[in-house]
A protein has these predicted regions:
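Positively charged n-region of N-terminal signal peptides that target proteins for export
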Residues: 1-6
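Short, well-structured alpha-helical segments in soluble
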Residues: 25-27, 91-102, 232-240
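Structural recognition of the beta-strand scaffold that forms the well-ordered cores
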Residues: 36-38, 57-60, 105-109, 124-128, ...
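A short, structured surface patch at a secondary-structure boundary
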Residues: 38-101, 105, 110, 214-217
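Alpha-helical, coiled-coil/dimerization segments enriched in small aliphatic residues
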Residues: 200-228
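Active-site/pore-lining binding-face segments in mid-to-C-terminal subdomains
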Residues: 244-305
Length: 343
């Protein structure tokens, strides 16, 4: 059986050339831009490239709302220089405030985030990959990475492709064994006590479950349009599905396990009875969305379902190595505990 310790070294070796690439690039003059990113998930990709990160002056507030700011501030002590104030409370763009940032490049993710950004009079770049690739986390992060680097005149680093490739190779023997068990999983996007939303087919959540060898209980639903892929369901529907395991993204696994959400009856599910309800980690962003740490998520899911395959200690070691190789960040124990703790 492939050990995660070996995977850890593979990941480190796969990424070890990146610092040399960066230093070589710094020998050549690089034009400094003032860039704005209206979305949240693409910002994580820029955090892995110091030459790109230093050029960011504004980012959508979701980038910080769904992050563990203790981790983000420790890794990037200057993060406070990046403003979110150009986004109004209704999530529309405040053009007057945006222009005070004097941007020369604006990146947005999908047409819903455009908000007539051409009014700013500077180039705008859509980070939506389009087609079926937009639901593939690896293809999406690869696209973001190369688009940022090309637009900013930076050398290609290929970090996220290598990170995902490492995960795919590492997880294969585990996923094959889990697949034989026909584990039925629910990817619970939202569970705030008011709305229950799940990942249907052709979503990032569906992809993560499949990578980990699990079957998405909502994967057979008929959906249409991007918004429809994240499906509002009833508690009765979830009880009928009776999932073996539940991964909670924007919500609290503890709230479900302790029945703290009014009107929800999780004790009727197999996952609740076996205490197999888990929150996705939160670091630079929530891993369960599409964060800079998400290449680790399928292995995290395996570690919760089958700790004999991937132990907590191995998951901690892999996470620590990932932060160091991707961000040159030595995460302290107390913050590593925060990232991997159950909410």
């Amino acid at each position: 059986m492939l050990k995660v310790l070996h995977v850890l070294y593979t990941l480190m070796l796969a990424l070890c050339l990146f610092p040399m690439v960066v230093h070589a690039a710094m020998d050549e003059p690089i034009r400094h831009h003032r860039i704005i990113i209206t979305g949240n998930c693409p910002f994580g990709v820029i955090l892995a490239n110091p030459l790109a990160y230093r050029q960011v002056v504004g980012v959508g507030p979701w980038a910080f709302l769904h992050a563990d700011m203790n981790v983000l501030k420790d890794m990037k002590p200057d993060i406070g220089r990046i403003t979110t104030h150009f986004i109004n409370d209704d999530y529309s763009v405040n053009l007057e405030t945006l222009l005070t940032l004097h941007p020369d490049l604006i990146f947005y993710y999908g047409q819903s985030q455009n908000d007539h950004l051409e009014r700013a009079g500077v180039p705008v770049i859509n980070l939506d990959t389009g087609g079926s690739a937009k639901y593939d986390p690896e293809a999406t992060q690869n696209y973001w990475e190369t688009t940022f680097e090309d637009a900013l005149g930076l050398p290609r680093t290929d970090k996220f492709h290598r990170a995902w490739e490492t995960t795919r190779k590492a997880i294969q023997p585990y996923a094959d064994r889990i697949r034989q068990q026909h584990v039925r999983a629910l990817y619970l996007e939202q569970s705030d006590g008011k709305t229950l939303r799940v990942s249907g087919p052709h979503t990032f959540g569906d992809t993560y479950l499949n990578m980990a060898g699990m079957e998405n209980v909502a994967g057979h639903l008929q959906v249409s349009g991007d918004a429809g892929r994240y499906i509002t369901v009833s508690m009765e529907q979830i009880m009928a599905w009776n999932p073996d395991v539940i991964f909670v993204v924007f919500g609290s696994a503890r709230a479900l396990l302790n029945n703290r959400n009014p009107g929800q009856m999780w004790q009727g599910t197999r996952a609740w009875k076996n205490k197999r309800i888990y929150s996705t980690p939160v670091g630079l962003h929530n891993w369960g969305g599409l964060s800079a740490e998400t290449p680790l998520l399928p292995l995290f899911m395996v570690s919760k379902l089958e700790p004999d395959f991937v132990s907590d200690a191995e998951m901690r070691g892999l996470t620590r190595a990932y932060y160091k190789t991707m961000f040159d960040y030595a995460i302290p124990d107390r913050l590593l505990n925060e990232v991997l703790s159950q909410r």
